[in-house]
């Protein structure tokens, strides 16, 4: 189970492709079998090429069942280091979790103002999502809450109903639009960096320093499950 955005990574759910090559030839990649040793792994090659090796016209996907229960939680932290450390420990302890998202202090403040959020602090914040049975989700939430508290986490809240889950994640869902609303005729450019989660804190701190150095405002959102974070730069 992915700890980034969704149940599994894209490469894991794509089983085959139909691709039009530059010379006009049409090829099919992949296999219906779970394993194959016949030839090169062209499916992953074309996924990683981002359209430079051929135009993908059809995609074969492996479907997953809808989880019996989906729950969400949020937790505030005094520092970015504490938030990242919590995510690291949740993953290291093998807690089954579908998503771990992070907003830095600046982005939380922007989201709070834009979405008129109450009882939410402008501090580094983690957003969790759990998939599974209701019993397993309840157990995993307790584990994550305990890990969060050990890392100085506060205001831990969780919900299971869709409306309540959306309220908890409101600051996360409105990231792009909240940043866009800060500028009139300018644009928002998104960077996309992926690195070992142990290096996230150092990299984010450096990115924040560079943004200040050049007079830019660049709030950040992180997909900590896969060590990915984005800076939303105002131009």
Segments (PLM) and residue ranges:
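Structural signature of FAD isoalloxazine-binding scaffolds in flavoprotein oxidoreductases
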Residues: 6-23, 55-58, 123
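Short, conserved aromatic-histidine micro-motifs
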Residues: 17-31, 69-86
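C-terminal substrate-recognition/cap domain of FAD-linked oxidoreductases
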Residues: 65, 74-233
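Flexible, small-/acidic-enriched active-site or ligand-binding loops
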Residues: 35-37
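Short beta-strand-to-turn element immediately C-terminal to the catalytic PLP-Schiff-base lysine
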Residues: 20, 47-48, 56-58, 62, ...
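Residue-level structural signal for beta-strand termini and adjacent loop
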Residues: 31-32, 59
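Single conserved hydrophobic/aromatic residue that forms the stacking wall/gate
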Residues: 1-5, 9, 233-234
């Amino acid at each position: 189970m992915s700890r980034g955005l969704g149940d599994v990574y894209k490469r894991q759910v794509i089983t085959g492709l139909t691709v039009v090559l530059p010379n006009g030839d049409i090829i099919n990649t992949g296999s219906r079998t779970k394993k194959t040793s016949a030839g090169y792994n062209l499916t992953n090659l074309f996924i990683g090429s981002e359209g430079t090796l051929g135009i993908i016209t059809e995609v074969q996907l492996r479907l997953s069942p809808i989880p019996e229960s989906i729950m969400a939680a949020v937790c505030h932290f005094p520092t970015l280091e504490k938030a990242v450390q919590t995510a690291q420990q949740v993953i290291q302890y093998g807690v089954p979790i579908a998503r771990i998202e992070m907003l830095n202090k600046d982005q939380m403040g922007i989201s709070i103002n834009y979405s008129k959020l109450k009882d939410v602090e402008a501090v580094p914040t983690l957003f969790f999502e759990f998939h599974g049975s209701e019993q397993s989700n309840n157990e995993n939430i307790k584990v994550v809450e305990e890990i969060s508290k050990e890392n100085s986490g506060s205001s831990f809240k969780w919900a299971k109903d869709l409306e309540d889950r959306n309220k908890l994640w409101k600051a996360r869902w409105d990231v792009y639009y909240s940043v866009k609303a800060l500028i009139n005729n300018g644009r928002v450019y998104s960077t996309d960096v992926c690195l070992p989660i142990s290096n996230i804190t150092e990299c984010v701190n450096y990115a924040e320093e560079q943004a200040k150095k050049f007079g830019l405002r660049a709030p950040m959102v992180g997909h900590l499950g896969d060590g990915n974070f984005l800076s939303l730069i105002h131009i």
